[in-house]
């Protein structure tokens, strides 16, 4: 009976999160699920404490990074960067396509996939419309912004909430994670550029007139804060690198930097700090705790052991098969039931599997790659994608779920394969 309850509660929670009836917040949906598993006795008080211990650092780090990115957006930092990329293309369509993806990859690395997709996309959309592109020409650039935000959100622990949760679960330190995922991220970037170019090659204009694009300096709304932002970024990077050596949770460092930046931004006329703070994804904290408790319910009734047995079987076929198998399992599960519950279920199953340590390491990182890229197959793969599609509708661009799936599955599978190949080469060479 307990097993049935755990499964039913999981699917009820998942349905509420994806469907969001009457705008029901994802945090509330996850808490409803959490309360149900607590009331029914599927999880206990010890589980609650364990879950909070796992997710608090991850979620607070994520919120801090998004806060910093929102202030940077307010002062025109990302628009300034995007204009530079367009100007650098010198009127060459393919160059602009590639440069925008490189910019998206950089933003995703340092400010998470959500920041890259939700901040960069409206900026790029406004610029290419200003260039006089019709809807057929707009589509490749919009898809590229959304895709690259996830496909290159691998290199740093903070680049994706999925990364943070998995790294915290397995106790992976910042530098250790970077050393393993830097090369796979490069493979993903190169594969993304090649696959997206091949798919959209007939829709990318050969040339365009850049005379209508304003100068980069015109995008800067607060020169003082713009200059300070470079110091903030330097401190952020240093903080990432030294956090594990000084044994301070990375959320303390990112949180402190975010608070300092907010206090400095309060003196600016262009940054509305109250709106920035309100716009941060605080519901992610509640969502993560609630969703994790629901997943722990599945673990407690032995459901994750089924997946663990499957992974143990895959592990017997060697490192390459283990990485590919885990990566594609994670990707398709993410596409079907969202990447957050997927990465949690997979992480627990990997931990419970009988794979040897070297194989298990490959599976841990392959799970992250699959959960980062898998959401590009379907709109429900990640909460960020659903929000991204909603933002596009508000901007007058409607992408149907059918169009998204038809495009997403063709683009994602080859990129996923080459990214996992990059991980395999990293682990056998280094």
Curated annotation (Swiss-Prot):
Disulfide bonds: none
GO molecular function ontology, one term from the record: arsenite transmembrane transporter activity
Keywords attached to this entry: Arsenical resistance, Cell membrane, Membrane, Transmembrane, Transmembrane helix, Transport
Any single biological process term in GO: response to arsenic-containing substance
Listed InterPro entries: Arsenical_pump_ArsB
UniProt GO cellular component terms: plasma membrane
Homology family: Belongs to the ArsB family.
Protein name: Arsenical pump membrane protein
Species whose genome carries this gene: Staphylococcus epidermidis (strain ATCC 35984 / DSM 28319 / BCRC 17069 / CCUG 31568 / BM 3577 / RP62A)
